[in-house]
């Protein structure tokens, strides 16, 4: 199973293609750090606008780097919460558009739960002994 994963919860626009939940075929990140540093922190409106500018190109590059065409994907995963609402809306709406255009299923992903699940990318058994607070 191959998924396109889209992340836009704060100040980085990211897209990756992941195979079988473990193998990263691509991972493209557009950072906004240089833009926000002059303000001393992330400015939500600027972050949202920069996501809107970057998301299409980041996604195109992730698909190209993976060698997997859009029509060969099995689904689209997207961060829906928590995060900056405007930034999240850019990613969610872009993913929804792709889902509607292609007929691919859309999988909403909770950002904090994905940090926990990231253990499955590096540990064969999922790092069965890790703690988290629910």
Predicted regions and their residues:
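Short acidic/glycine-rich loops and adjacent helix/strand connectors
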Residues: 1-134
